[in-house]
């Protein structure tokens, strides 16, 4: 059983399994209506500053920040910690014991922001996440729906934020079309709004 199945694995199952069954609940890649999708367009060099500003704007944030690579994940987590944020990282270069320890701290809310790769976050089941932040959009729409699906669970609301570069505008439109949901275009909070 798998909540999500990558295309590569699906093709292997079709090749080697006799008459496999697939159970789909709802439309594939359908957007959860309890999640508000917001994107912020920023210059590439301003992505980290935008992330900090958004974390400051939502002081009670309890969420996952998704990055594209292990290296980026660790760098962003290190910067956040250095800048005084309650954060840690989750990626494939950590031992299983380290991952378990980080997840234990995150589940009991001793960590406010978990910076993670898609692979490390597969199957994460954490209650009450308020936000998912995409530090850049994933290549696959299915990855986006998986990321945003970490919040807004069990009838609760959630916010999926994407910090994008102008070159990613087309990806936003593609995701909107596939999940059949329009994103809100966010305006970066001012210093006055944060204080």
Summary of predicted features, one role per range:
Residues 1-195:
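Conserved helicase RecA-like core
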């Amino acid at each position: 059983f798998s909540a999500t199945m990558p295309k590569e694995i699906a093709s292997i199952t079709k090749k080697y399994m006799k008459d496999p069954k697939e159970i789909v609940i709802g439309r594939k890649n359908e957007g959860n209506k309890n999640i508000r999708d917001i994107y912020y367009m920023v210059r590439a060099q301003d992505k980290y500053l935008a992330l900090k500003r958004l974390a400051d704007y939502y002081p009670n944030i309890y969420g996952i920040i998704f990055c594209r690579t292990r290296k980026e994940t660790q760098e962003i987590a290190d910067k956040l910690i250095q800048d005084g944020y309650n954060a840690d990282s989750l990626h494939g270069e950590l031992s299983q014991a380290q991952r378990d320890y980080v997840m234990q701290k995150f589940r009991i809310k001793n960590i406010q922001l978990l910076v993670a790769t898609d692979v490390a976050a597969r199957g994460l089941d954490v209650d009450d996440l308020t936000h998912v932040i995409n530090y850049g959009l994933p290549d696959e729409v299915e990855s986006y729906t998986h990321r945003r699906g970490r919040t807004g669970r069990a009838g609760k609301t959630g916010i999926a934020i994407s910090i994008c570069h102008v070159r990613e505008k087309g990806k936003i439109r593609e995701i909107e079309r596939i999940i059949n949901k329009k994103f809100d275009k966010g305006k970066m909070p001012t210093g006055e709004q944060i204080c």
